[in-house]
Amino acid sequence: MGEHPSPGPAVAACAEAERIEELEPEAEERLPAAPEDHWKVLFEKFDPGSTGYISTGKFRSLLESHSSKLDPHKKEVLLALADSHADGQICYQDFVNLMSNKRSNSFRQAILQGNRRLSSKALLEEKGLSLSQRLIRHVAYETLPREIDRKWYYDSYTCCPPPWFMITITLLEVALFLYNGVLLDQFVLQVTHPRYLKNSLVYHPQLRAQAWRYVTYIFMHAGVEQLGLNVALQLLVGVPLEMVHGATRIGLVYVAGVVAGSLAVSVADMTAPVVGSSGGVYALVSAHLANIVMNWSGMKCQFKLLRMAVALICMSMEFGRAVWLRFHPSAYPPCPHPSFVAHLGGVAVGITLGVVVLRNYEQRLQDQSLWWIFVTMYTIFVLFAVFWNIFAYTLLDLKLPPAP
């Protein structure tokens, strides 16, 4: 499971080193194997005194003289970085970070706070793009609020690996729903079938000791009405987010929402079962919508207000359906219908952990204080819920519905 769809730093560094060697004939001598050493040899040609800095003038001259051979977007970022240094010098580490596809907060700030803003035409103004290039550009504008990040993503995305996590989850959900529908001979409001809860994937309070049920419940849906909305949101929101942020980060937010959803039900709605992937879906969509609101002026996706309104209406309708079903007379008394609290657990994860992930494109999450705050809060909640499930049901002398 990769963190980001672009190649790793070492691979990107070696590829870029070969490109620079083509641009600069003087760098044709044999270089050491380590990626940073490639850059050190080139850097030292412009820093004969080994000061650790080169003048921005020399740096600009190198880029301008080979502008026809160097990727225009990467050249633009390099120039912005060079012009951001008021002392007229660029340090070796910034040079290595850019060439190696390594991003840091200080590196981002050097660009964003520079004297020269990125002034060439934006991605939206470029013509003659292929269908795949237009798709990548569309995804960049749908998910990233900064032009510098959009250009970086556009240049580095290779579709290797593809957004496999969300697609795999979606295919499994659809396949298991169809299988269960054929088995029960019911597709609409499938959850009302008397044998529905007998499936070993459903979370049931009487079987809460079977830990896998806290996750596998996402593969069982109340009916085609719940499945349809969740699948649509996973494909329309989850897949683009995974293309940008990678399967590891998006999978982390999704699974965290799923687990938080079932644990929230076990604490707040103790007698109810749980089905559906709404916990994970609501985590992703809530994080995406919150990121748009927090970066409203920077997000350039078309009709963003209308699309946000449509997304909120769809989420509200699904939540309303879940609330109605929860209090509808049960098809298998005394056990109630599935709970709606998992939706709220997903939202809580989305506006905390999810927002931190989406706001820090290609940044180390370990360096973000908010990340550790929310991870700590999430861990405390999980531990609390585990102890609650072990002790509270007995202490409260709660009468649970019998196992299906």
Curated annotation (Swiss-Prot):
<keyword id="KW-0472">Membrane</keyword>
<keyword id="KW-0812">Transmembrane</keyword>
<dbReference type="InterPro" id="IPR011992">
    <property type="entry name" value="EF-hand-dom_pair"/>
</dbReference>
<dbReference type="InterPro" id="IPR051739">
    <property type="entry name" value="Rhomboid_IM_Serine_Proteases"/>
</dbReference>
<dbReference type="GO" id="GO:0006508">
    <property type="term" value="P:proteolysis"/>
</dbReference>
<feature type="transmembrane region" description="Helical">
    <location>
        <begin position="371"/>
        <end position="391"/>
    </location>
</feature>
<keyword id="KW-0720">Serine protease</keyword>
<feature type="active site">
    <location>
        <position position="343"/>
    </location>
</feature>
<feature type="domain" description="EF-hand 2">
    <location>
        <begin position="70"/>
        <end position="105"/>
    </location>
</feature>
<feature type="transmembrane region" description="Helical">
    <location>
        <begin position="338"/>
        <end position="358"/>
    </location>
</feature>
<dbReference type="GO" id="GO:0004252">
    <property type="term" value="F:serine-type endopeptidase activity"/>
</dbReference>
<protein>
    <recommendedName>
        <fullName>Rhomboid-related protein 3</fullName>
        <ecNumber>3.4.21.105</ecNumber>
    </recommendedName>
</protein>
<feature type="transmembrane region" description="Helical">
    <location>
        <begin position="274"/>
        <end position="294"/>
    </location>
</feature>
<dbReference type="Pfam" id="PF13499">
    <property type="entry name" value="EF-hand_7"/>
</dbReference>
<dbReference type="InterPro" id="IPR035952">
    <property type="entry name" value="Rhomboid-like_sf"/>
</dbReference>
<feature type="transmembrane region" description="Helical">
    <location>
        <begin position="250"/>
        <end position="270"/>
    </location>
</feature>
<feature type="domain" description="EF-hand 1">
    <location>
        <begin position="34"/>
        <end position="69"/>
    </location>
</feature>
<keyword id="KW-0645">Protease</keyword>
<keyword id="KW-0677">Repeat</keyword>
<dbReference type="Pfam" id="PF01694">
    <property type="entry name" value="Rhomboid"/>
</dbReference>
<feature type="transmembrane region" description="Helical">
    <location>
        <begin position="305"/>
        <end position="324"/>
    </location>
</feature>
<dbReference type="GO" id="GO:0016020">
    <property type="term" value="C:membrane"/>
</dbReference>
<dbReference type="InterPro" id="IPR017213">
    <property type="entry name" value="Peptidase_S54_rhomboid_met"/>
</dbReference>
<feature type="transmembrane region" description="Helical">
    <location>
        <begin position="164"/>
        <end position="184"/>
    </location>
</feature>
<keyword id="KW-0378">Hydrolase</keyword>
<dbReference type="InterPro" id="IPR002048">
    <property type="entry name" value="EF_hand_dom"/>
</dbReference>
<comment type="function">
    <text>May be involved in regulated intramembrane proteolysis and the subsequent release of functional polypeptides from their membrane anchors.</text>
</comment>
<feature type="active site" description="Nucleophile">
    <location>
        <position position="278"/>
    </location>
</feature>
<comment type="similarity">
    <text>Belongs to the peptidase S54 family.</text>
</comment>
<dbReference type="InterPro" id="IPR022764">
    <property type="entry name" value="Peptidase_S54_rhomboid_dom"/>
</dbReference>
<dbReference type="GO" id="GO:0005509">
    <property type="term" value="F:calcium ion binding"/>
</dbReference>
<feature type="transmembrane region" description="Helical">
    <location>
        <begin position="227"/>
        <end position="247"/>
    </location>
</feature>
<keyword id="KW-1133">Transmembrane helix</keyword>
